[in-house]
Amino acid sequence: VIGLPRSGTTFLFNLLSLDNNHRSPLYWEIMNPLPLVKNNKQEVWRKRKINLELKFARVIIPKLKNMHHIRAETPEECELIATMNVRSFVYICMANIPEYVEYLKNCSFTSVFEWHKKFFQMLECSGRPNRWLLKDPSHIGHIPEIITTYPNAKFINIHRSPIESIASFCSLTKNIRSTFSKYVESESIGETVLDFWQHSLNKGIDDRKVLPDNQIADIAYSEFINNPI
């Protein structure tokens, strides 16, 4: 599932994850994928640990609960896997570092998706699904790397007015950055967010031209919200 952030990607992702033919990575699997020791209590302990961490996150970022719903056992997007390669828009949300934004726009993501594949192969130790269902807004800017890593990947691109989605993401970024940075400027956030996602969207528009029609589907946000099923 691809599309600009705050464009209904999470709603669509969660809806599709209800299909038993799909498997999506759960938040606790991404944040704590390997047990310290092998016993039946490890999974329960890891889920409990993640829920405690999320409870703390909601304390330091009070508005997060209403802006982005996360629990240990809910499906989660791939972006947190990319943070392990230190190439993720998550860091843009945390601090104003213009040099990093330019780096992220122009660097290669080949190794990111090589690691991405290994990560999911590791999760498959508990069983290989019929199909992995994944979601990440930033994937819209990395279609070639995805196709190189997963030649049979299929994309669902959800479309929402950038005026609405970018404004919403700016608000989310401001709330996150306020936790990590002493000085937060709304104007700077707006410029950075607009620049980064404009670059990603334009790249995605060009890159998707190489995809055959049966490898990508488009959904309008307004139609999806009015009639999800």
Question: Predicted regions span which residues?
Answer:
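Glycine-rich phosphate-binding P-loop
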Residues: I2-N20
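Short, glycine/charge-rich beta-strand/loop segments that flank catalytic centers
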Residues: V1-R6, E29-P35
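Post-Walker A helix-loop "phosphate-sensing" segment adjacent to the P-loop in P-loop NTPases
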Residues: L18-W28
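PAPS-dependent sulfotransferase catalytic domain
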Residues: N106-R131, D136-T149, A153-I229
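Short, charged low-complexity intrinsically disordered segments located at boundaries
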Residues: P5-F11, E43-K49, I143-P151, R177
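PAPS-dependent sulfation machinery
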Residues: M31-W132
